[in-house]
């Protein structure tokens, strides 16, 4: 028995067809594919002490919600994770005791609603440069901490795409 858990990204493209089916030439050799769910959760979080995104005022809550709504988890699963993940709807994975299949606590991807939420709370382009500004008119750049790994570079690209579509400048702070 050979196990690849988790399967390296470069292996996935070599053994699976679209739809996560084992390639026929491998099946013809007697190789089988058994899939299992790993109870692993990856999440992003906000520094609640940060003057730009932190705090509990209505506009800061709206900002964090809009950022969450602008991130396309399905695209992350399809592109970055090569179809090898499930969207997390809660902190307890589906194969663990305590998971509630009726609870869905993750923000749904909805870019138009995210933009409308930012507009409503004053995060608009006030100086005409194409980027949203803070409600007080100051420039708005979101900083995201990230590592230098190839995997994190892919996530960074998706974050950049998501926030650019939302009209928010982004600056990645690379950890060494």
Residue ranges and their predicted role:
Residues 1-82, 86, 91, 95-176:
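Extracytoplasmic/periplasmic ligand-capture domains
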């Amino acid at each position: 028995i050979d196990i690849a858990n988790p399967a390296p990204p470069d292996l996935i493209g070599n053994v699976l067809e679209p739809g996560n089916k084992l390639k026929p030439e491998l099946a013809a050799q007697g190789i089988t594919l058994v899939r299992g769910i790993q109870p692993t959760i990856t999440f992003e979080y906000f520094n609640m002490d940060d003057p730009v995104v932190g705090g509990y005022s209505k506009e800061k809550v709206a900002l964090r919600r809009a950022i969450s709504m602008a991130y396309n988890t399905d695209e992350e699963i399809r592109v970055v994770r090569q179809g090898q993940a499930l969207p997390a709807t809660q902190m307890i994975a589906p194969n663990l005791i305590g998971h509630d299949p009726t609870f869905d606590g993750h923000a749904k991807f909805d870019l138009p609603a995210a933009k409308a939420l930012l507009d409503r709370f004053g995060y608009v382009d006030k100086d005409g440069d194409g980027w949203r500004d803070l409600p007080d008119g100051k420039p708005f750049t979101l900083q995201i901490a990230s590592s230098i790994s190839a995997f994190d570079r892919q996530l960074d690209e998706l974050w950049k795409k998501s926030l650019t579509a939302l009209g928010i400048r982004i600056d990645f702070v690379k950890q060494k």
